From Swiss-Prot:
Cofactor note: Binds 1 zinc ion per subunit.
This protein's name: 7-cyano-7-deazaguanine synthase
Gene name, Swiss-Prot/TrEMBL: queC
UniProt record similarity statement: Belongs to the QueC family.
InterPro entries: QueC (IPR018317), Rossmann-like_a/b/a_fold (IPR014729)
A single GO BP: queuosine biosynthetic process
CC cofactor: Zn(2+)
Binding site for Zn(2+): C186, C195, C198, C201
Pfam families named among the record's database cross-references: QueC
UniProt key word Oxidoreductase: no
Keywords assigned: ATP-binding, Ligase, Metal-binding, Nucleotide-binding, Queuosine biosynthesis, Zinc
Top-level EC class as recorded in UniProt: ligase
Alphabetized GO MF terms: ATP binding; ligase activity, forming carbon-nitrogen bonds; zinc ion binding
Length: 220
């Protein structure tokens, strides 16, 4: 893959930034694409742009605001509480988001001569999002190839690893401190370690604490 080109679906968060560093190691040329779907914190887009600029990555932002018209949710509406009731999808789930994001990323990839698409979806720390499942990604990969008659390959480096292992991967890629300090995972829009209270921050911190304990134990 070293001689090929890839497009990374990029939000500026921990997972997609780790995937960006992974792609930079795997491919000769990498571009990033971010989607503006009127998410609650526009800082997410600014954060992604700043990271791409710092890493020298060509960055495209696509307007997907129609998603908010079709599927209002807690990620786009300040009047909706972030909740996750047992047996129900979290209020942060956006119907069709990864389906649309990966489809538009594929269109962009074909236009820029890339056949590889990288996304940070994960089934291990799966929050109940059906569009983060491996079966969905594999199915969409086939559909995209048929729809555009093009040999796309969707890569999911984080699919079978948990948050602690994602931190480990960022460390192996030499990006641990960068990811910890400069990414935005927090639902409340706080860069770095975040608010510590929202579900995204709690998951991120639990993974970080586990990895740091493992790393310390390995060094003793």
């Amino acid at each position: 893959m070293k001689k090929e080109k890839a497009v990374v679906v990029f939000s500026g968060g921990q997972d997609s930034t780790t995937c960006l560093f992974w792609a930079m190691e795997q491919f000769a040329e990498v571009e990033a694409v971010t989607f503006n779907y009127n998410q609650r914190h526009k800082l997410e887009i600014d954060c992604a742009a700043e990271i791409a600029k710092e890493l020298g990555i060509k960055h495209t932002v696509l307007d997907m605001s129609l998603l908010n018209q079709l599927a209002p949710n807690a990620l786009t509406r300040t009047d909706m509480e972030i909740t996750h009731e047992e047996g129900e999808l979290p209020s942060t789930f956006v119907d069709g988001r990864n389906l649309l994001f990966l489809s538009f990323a594929a269109v962009l990839a074909k236009q820029v001569g890339a056949r590889h698409i990288v996304t940070g979806v994960c089934e291990t720390d799966f929050s109940g999002y059906p569009d983060c499942r491996d079966v969905f990604v594999k199915s969409l990969n086939v559909t995209l190839n048929l729809s555009m008659d093009y040999p796309f390959v969707i890569h999911t480096p984080l699919m079978w690893i948990d948050k602690a292992e994602t931190w480990k991967l960022s460390d192996e890629l030499g990006a641990f401190e960068f990811v910890r300090e400069k990414t935005l995972t927090c639902y409340n829009g706080i860069i770095g370690d975040g608010c510590g209270e929202c579900p995204a921050c709690q998951l991120r911190k639990a993974g970080l604490d586990t990895y740091l304990q493992e790393r310390e134990g390995a060094s003793n």
